[in-house]
């Protein structure tokens, strides 16, 4: 009991930052996935005596996690519902690449990642959750009422991670890799994938989760405690998340 009270007191004294975007109809997402749809008055006070919305959304909506089954036919049994609820709890290390102004199709090399690590005084260790801040969540700000071409740009354009970065993270034995882009390690230009070494080679085949669509990484320090839980979707290829940073 004393340990629980101590934990509660500790948590109440710390900062908590939400790292997810708000879900809404036709929000930006991966260009070939179905759109998010929210039926706002599925039930209403006038007809039903209460208010309720109906959500129609792909598993990979907003901030979300990819399970190995998402892209690997030989791991079709590794769906999101089989993993423990605390699979995405752990120490997070942020790699801030936002000042590099990477363009869609660019690949961040290991030399730059190591430079940022040295500048911020962090080291990647086994079990870490490594999150890349490309500054691409700026393209999710106030886009809800913009034309579809502008709203969808984020889901079709992104920088990615060079192969040496993906190999480095695999060799370090990290728990998960994430970013504020739609596909983390993958680079694409106008919906055409130009590179992607993590999904099918270094990350998912080796049990390293991929977190995509993070929002607000600029608000958190270089190291913090990360918590996120996926929905327990039977046979799910992934799940939406509401991740938080605690520091």
Which residue stretches match the model-derived regions?
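Active-/binding-site microenvironments in catalytic and ligand-binding cores
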Residues: 1-247
């Amino acid at each position: 009991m004393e340990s629980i009270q101590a934990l509660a007191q500790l948590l109440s004294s710390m900062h908590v930052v939400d790292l997810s975007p708000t879900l809404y109809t036709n929000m930006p997402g991966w260009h070939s996935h179905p759109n998010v749809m929210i039926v706002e008055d599925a039930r209403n006070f006038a007809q039903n005596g209460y208010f309720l919305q109906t959500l129609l959304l792909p598993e990979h909506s907003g901030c979300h996690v990819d399970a190995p089954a998402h892209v690997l036919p030989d791991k079709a049994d590794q769906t999101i519902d089989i993993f423990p609820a605390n699979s995405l709890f752990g120490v997070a290390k942020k790699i801030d690449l936002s000042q590099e102004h990477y363009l869609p199709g660019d690949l961040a090399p290991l030399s730059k990642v190591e430079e940022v690590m040295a500048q911020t005084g962090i080291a990647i260790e086994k079990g870490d959750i490594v999150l890349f801040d490309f500054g691409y969540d700026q393209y999710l700000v106030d886009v809800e009422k913009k034309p579809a071409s502008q709203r969808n740009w984020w889901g079709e354009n992104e920088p990615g991670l060079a192969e040496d970065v993906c190999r480095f993270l695999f060799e370090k034995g990290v728990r998960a890799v994430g970013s504020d882009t739609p596909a983390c390690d993958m680079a694409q230009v106008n919906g055409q994938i130009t590179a992607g070494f993590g999904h099918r080679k270094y990350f998912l085949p080796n049990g390293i989760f991929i977190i995509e669509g993070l929002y607000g990484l600029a608000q958190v320090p270089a190291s913090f405690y990360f918590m996120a839980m996926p929905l327990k979707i039977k046979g799910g290829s992934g799940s939406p998340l509401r991740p938080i940073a605690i520091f």
